[in-house]
Design a protein with these regions (language model features):
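Short loop/turn motifs that connect adjacent beta-strands in outer-membrane beta-barrel proteins
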Residues: 28-41, 54-56, 97-106, 150-163, ...
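Solvent-exposed loop segments that connect transmembrane elements
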Residues: 57-78, 119-135, 185-194, 235-286, ...
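Detector for outer-membrane/organellar transmembrane beta-barrel domains
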Residues: 86-90, 316-318, 323, 393, ...
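Outer membrane beta-barrel
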Residues: 100-251, 510, 539, 547-552, ...
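Outer-membrane beta-barrel "beta-signal"
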Residues: 585-597
Length: 597
């Protein structure tokens, strides 16, 4: 259950957004009574599968694994699945229970899943493990999602509601594009990857207090205070969309350098500076995650309903739900041991000392994931209907201290600065120090959405068109010769092969669009919804992967349902375009069947 004001829930704009996101009507929930307690129980069961439709792009695979890319930290998922192979084969269920006594109630939602492909099948390149993973990233599991109590009341005939417990609160008017005002809850990325996924499966409820109170017939104030912090669930390493180094428990995938140094590993151990070398290179050890604290997350909103338009003002203080990557430079003891190791290495294999020194500095360094705290967000939104019947919404958000990820190649090369006279990376470092993976920047984002319904089109009862565009401005960026942000490590360090593009720019923009045709009662009560989705990052490179110039995606699909009870969905998604698009070889087909009761 997503928490919004009652007024917001029933606006045409909210309905249009739900349609655009592909939400379909559920069958009538099972209703029951226990004395004066009213209850409903709603269930969805589904089976599905997904297949990869392209071979791995060699330019996105590291050289140590037969490709031409400058990093191997994204190789596991690419080399685990060939073209045409199944990368997910899943059965899952989700259940909602609501109990009401007068104006007071309890809502609980839970889900479970089992992916036979990831759980039971062997992988060609590297095994996929659930050990140490977040529950949502595992190949099989069960979770309680929402679990809260609520009470509806009136003060002087002005409605109000309070909620306490695990819940989702949605603010703002964003439909497709992230980094918006709607940043209260983290996302379960793994859940959204599964065939047949529903919106409610991928939003992570968080323990919080929420309240909404009408001040007049036109003004409503809302607020929340989170009782805990939680993080976005990332794809498990080795899965089709996963990277090797980010998810919880993926601790040995940050490999760099030349694996040919392996014969000299015993020498490093003898000097008390042992390192780990695999077939992919030197392992940079993962340190403990720097999780955000539970306290200090709160927000307030003021809504004004005019004659034809609803306006909103927002403020939030929250901690990042997505991680930044930082590194830790090897300590003084490692530097002190280097001359002895290098001398012996050169005696054993002339010229090998330099490579050994670099490998030791990398292998005795480390990396960590950090979740920056106390991000401030100021926002404003509007929602209206134009004379044409088109729903028009928009919002602006401003974060004066948003964390922006520093280029990870520069962070890795910073580990070599103590033996390179500070010239390996523009990031200054000292032995034993942390190299913070982000800098705080002013980030402003403006976005707008149009939704229109056309009746009786191409034999369909309705055609729904939704389009959303956004522009992002990042203030205070340094020149690229001083510090770079963003860009995947597979493209190498700044200036490699003369390439100096692809890093975060001060301005970036893109748009998303979706079209849905509704064919009712096509054959024997079966309803069909052919749909087309389009994504285009037009210009610039946004912070933290928001926009990637030239990157495009198209998805063609059809959804079917019978009496709002039995469902089926088939879609094909193609990623293409852009010079720095790591998704361009991740095309896939998804098929699912479900039942709602």
């Amino acid at each position: 259950m997503t928490t919004k004001t009652m007024r917001a829930i029933f606006t045409p704009q909210a309905l249009a957004a739900a349609v655009a996101l592909g939400c379909c009507a559920q069958a009538q929930a099972v209703a029951f009574n226990i004395g004066e307690i009213e209850g409903t129980f709603d269930s969805s069961l589904s089976v599905g599968a997904s297949w990869g439709m392209r071979d791995a792009d060699k330019s996105l695979v590291g050289t140590v694994n037969g490709g031409t890319g400058q990093s191997s930290t994204g190789d596991d998922g690419r080399l685990n699945f060939k073209k045409g192979e199944t990368f997910s084969k899943i059965v899952k269920g989700i259940h909602d229970l609501e109990l009401k006594y007068g104006d007071t109630g309890v809502f609980v939602r839970g889900k479970y899943w089992y992916d036979f492909e990831l759980k039971d099948e062997d992988r060609e390149f590297k095994p996929i493990s659930d050990k140490g993973r977040k529950e949502g990233a595992k190949s099989s599991g069960a979770q309680i999602l929402d679990a809260f109590v609520y009470h509806n009341y009136s003060i002087a005939d002005l409605p109000g509601t309070v909620r306490a417990g695990k819940q989702v609160v949605s603010w703002g008017e964003s439909t497709f594009i992230g980094n918006s005002i709607n940043s209260i809850n983290p996302i379960d990325v793994s859940a959204f990857r599964r065939p047949g996924a529903e919106i409610k499966e991928g939003l992570i409820p968080v323990n919080m207090l929420f309240g909404s109170q009408g001040l007049t017939d036109q003004f409503t104030v809302e607020g929340f205070y989170q009782l805990e912090w939680d993080q976005t669930v990332l794809d498990n390493c080795g899965t089709f969309f996963g990277v090797d180094v980010a998810a919880d428990g993926c601790n040995n995938g940050y490999t760099v350098g030349n694996p040919a140094i392996a014969p000299l590993v015993p020498l490093t151990t003898a000097f008390g500076q042992g390192i780990q070398v695999t077939r992919e290179g030197v392992v940079i050890p993962r340190g403990g995650d720097r999780d955000a604290r539970d306290s200090g997350q709160w927000g307030t909103a003021l809504r004004w309903l005019g004659d034809d338009t609803e306006y909103g003002l927002y403020f939030m203080n929250y901690h990042s739900r997505t991680p930044t990557v930082g590194t830790t430079t090897a300590g003084l003891s490692t530097l002190a041991a280097l001359p002895g190791m290098v001398g012996i290495a050169n005696g054993l294999a002339p010229g090998s000392g330099s490579g050994l020194a670099q490998s030791v500095m990398l292998g005795r360094g480390g990396y960590y994931l950090e979740y920056p705290e106390d991000i401030r967000l100021y926002g404003a939104s509007f929602s209206t209907t134009l004379p044409t019947g088109t729903a028009w919404t928009g919002e602006i958000s401003y974060r004066p201290n948003a964390p922006v990820q520093v280029n990870t190649n520069d962070l890795t090369l910073a580990l070599l600065n103590p033996i390179a006279g500070g010239t390996a990376s523009p990031i200054a470092t000292t032995p034993g120090s942390d190299n913070k993976g982000y800098r705080r920047k002013e980030v402003t984002q403006i976005q707008s959405t149009l939704t229109h319904f056309f009746d009786q089109v191409w034999g369909a009862q309705r055609l729904t068109l939704v389009g959303e565009a956004a522009v992002v401005r990042v203030g205070g960026l340094e020149s690229r010769s001083k510090l770079r942000y963003g860009r995947d490590s597979v493209y190498g360090q700044y200036g490699f092969g003369g390439d100096t593009d692809g890093f975060v720019t001060s301005t970036s923009w893109g748009y998303r669009a979706r079209a849905i045709l509704d064919y009712a009662n096509v054959i024997g009560g079966i309803n069909l919804k052919p749909n087309l989705s389009w994504s285009h990052d037009v210009a610039g490179y946004g912070p933290n992967g928001l926009f990637n110039e030239g990157a495009k995606a198209i998805s063609v699909g059809v959804d079917a349902d019978y009496r709002n009870t039995y469902t089926a969905s088939l879609s094909y998604t193609d990623f293409f375009g852009g010079d720095y698009n790591v998704l361009e070889d991740r095309d896939f087909v998804a098929l699912s069947f479900g039942v709602n009761f």
